[in-house]
């Protein structure tokens, strides 16, 4: 998972990055 603490583990994380 990304080092971004604001980004939770899981598909939602990738959606947020996009």
Curated annotation (Swiss-Prot):
Gene Ontology annotations for the cellular component aspect, listed alphabetically: extracellular region
GO BP terms, alphabetized: neuropeptide signaling pathway
Subcellular location: Secreted
Xref: PROSITE patterns: TACHYKININ (PS00267)
Domain of life: Eukaryota
Keyword annotations: Amidation, Disulfide bond, Neuropeptide, Secreted
Predominant place of localization: secreted
InterPro entries attached to this UniProt entry: Tachy_Neuro_lke_CS
Disulfide bonds: 7-13
Modified residues (Methionine amide): 18
UniProt record similarity statement: Belongs to the tachykinin family.
Role noted for this protein: Tachykinins are active peptides which excite neurons, evoke behavioral responses, are potent vasodilators and secretagogues, and contract (directly or indirectly) many smooth muscles.
Protein name per its UniProtKB record: Scyliorhinin-2
Organism this protein belongs to: Scyliorhinus canicula (Small-spotted catshark)
